[in-house]
């Protein structure tokens, strides 16, 4: 499930929530450019929904200060 999408000219940053095979909450951060296949992702494992929302707030603040916009 996509939680937030950010974009900046030719770049994007997406945040997904997903449970892994062990039932743990996982926040998946994916980034890259619109015009190529280059990019990456990382997994942040959260103990509960509250921790996941705290991570979302932290990442959103960073993205917005770097001139990304929500879409």
What is each model feature region?
Residues 65-71:
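Boundary/linker segments flanking structured domains
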Residues 1-8, 37-38, 49:
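Negatively charged, low-complexity tracts enriched in Asp/Glu with abundant Ser/Thr
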Residues 1, 7-8, 26-29, 63:
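Alpha-helical structural elements
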Residues 12:
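Double-stranded DNA-binding cores of transcription factors and transposases
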Residues 37-40, 46-64:
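A short, charged, amphipathic alpha-helix used as a generic interaction element across diverse proteins
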Residues 8-9, 54:
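Extended, non-core accessory segments
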Residues 16-42:
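Short aromatic-glycine-(Arg/Gly/Cys) micro-motifs in beta-strand/loop hairpins
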């Amino acid at each position: 499930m996509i939680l937030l999408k950010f974009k900046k000219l030719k770049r994007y940053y997406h945040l997904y929530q997903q449970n892994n095979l062990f039932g743990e909450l996982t926040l998946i951060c994916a980034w890259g450019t619109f015009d190529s296949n280059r990019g990456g992702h990382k997994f942040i494992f959260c103990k509960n929904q509250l921790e996941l929302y705290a991570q979302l707030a932290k990442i959103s603040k960073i993205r917005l200060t770097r001139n990304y916009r929500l879409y």
